[in-house]
């Protein structure tokens, strides 16, 4: 009985000590500030990359950033130059109005949707066509 209590207590101590070290992220994922990240060196379009991320883990999406420290953390993991971010600018979803204040009901845009990549070498964000292919970083909140 005493041995069982000792083993149970030991396992509890190990579990509690691992709870802040990324043990809550799936295997192959990195942890930072309550989020899990995984770098995939696979070139995909933005739409395919976002779909791919949602298939990797139920709450996962393309990476988004909340701070420069978060970007620095990810760049330290990378062996890729350009990767998709979870932000895109779709012309047809903009809330536009005419100079007289009326709503824009008619749209005849020639521009294609623009998506955002991050260049890891200098942390700059670049607007590019969503049909280009780039590497993928998925992220979800723990």
From Swiss-Prot:
Tissue specificity annotation: Expressed by the venom gland.
UniProt KW keywords: Disulfide bond, Glycoprotein, Hemostasis impairing toxin, Secreted, Signal, Toxin
Molecular function GO labels: toxin activity
Disulfide bonds: 25-36, 53-138, 115-130
Family annotation (SUPFAM superfamilies): C-type lectin-like
Any Pfam family matching the protein: Lectin_C
Superkingdom classification of source: Eukaryota
PROSITE patterns membership: C_TYPE_LECTIN_1, C_TYPE_LECTIN_2
Chain ranges of the C-type lectin domain: 32-139
Any one GO cellular component localisation term in the record: extracellular region
Positions of glycan attachment: 43
Cell location: Secreted
The keyword Chaperone is annotated on this UniProt entry: no
Signal sequence, start to end: 1-23
Family: Belongs to the snaclec family.
Other facts noted in the record for this chain: Shows greater sequence similarity to the beta than alpha subunits compared to other heterodimer snaclecs.
SUBUNIT field: Heterodimer; disulfide-linked.
Described purpose of this protein according to its UniProt entry: Interferes with one step of hemostasis (modulation of platelet aggregation, or coagulation cascade, for example).
PANTHER family associated with the record: MANNOSE, PHOSPHOLIPASE, LECTIN RECEPTOR RELATED
Protein name per Swiss-Prot or TrEMBL: Snaclec 2
Species annotation: Sistrurus catenatus edwardsii (Desert massasauga)
